[in-house]
């Protein structure tokens, strides 16, 4: 696919989108993405990240939560992420001013993190060295391995709550070890669920798609994120 040609098509005709932003990401808010460049397995180049934000503007988005991974395999320091975010925010402001689009509004960018529930997270939680989600800083985006939960999964979620945070479980539809009753138990604990926007389209396969539909049917999701790692995902599924 010629990304430049597709970008021109989008910019000239934003209504060419398959889905309105309110359908894909309700309220024009992306609660989970990997657009912050060069910090994890997501976007690597500032240029590509800026292109992604330009596309989001054209789609009518309002807020974007940049949520890079923090885990033992990707041990991002919160101080480093804050600095990268501050620099990127300046680059975006400069890019927007240079483009000066009369019919668009600048996106509001926010920094949080997607936290793997592992030994590193337990250390960070104890030290309160975290990047929470939400305007009031009371939400904490967490994930587990796709294949198995940590042995102390529920106890760790309770520890998060005791620290004053509400855990938000990223893409619960993707966890192969979870059964319907597991989702119910988590909701009874007060855990919020964040759906990946393109799970419903089969991005992760039919089993995940089916689980996503079931969770939607039972109104278990609280927020939606793109989990965007690269531009091609936008063109394929939006």
Put a short name on every predicted segment.
Residues 2, 75-193:
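Extended substrate/RNA-proximal surfaces in nucleic-acid metabolism proteins
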Residues 31, 67, 142, 170, ...:
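Active-site flanking residues adjacent to catalytic metal/cofactor-binding acidic residues
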Residues 43-45, 73, 148-149, 175-178, ...:
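Acidic-and-aromatic substrate-binding clefts and catalytic sites of carbohydrate-active enzymes
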Residues 57, 161, 216-217:
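Non-catalytic positions within long, well-ordered alpha-helices that form the structural scaffold/packing
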Residues 69, 218-236:
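Short acidic/histidine-rich active-site segments
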Residues 191-202:
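His/Asp/Glu-enriched short active-site or ligand-binding loop at hydrolase and phosphoryl-transfer sites
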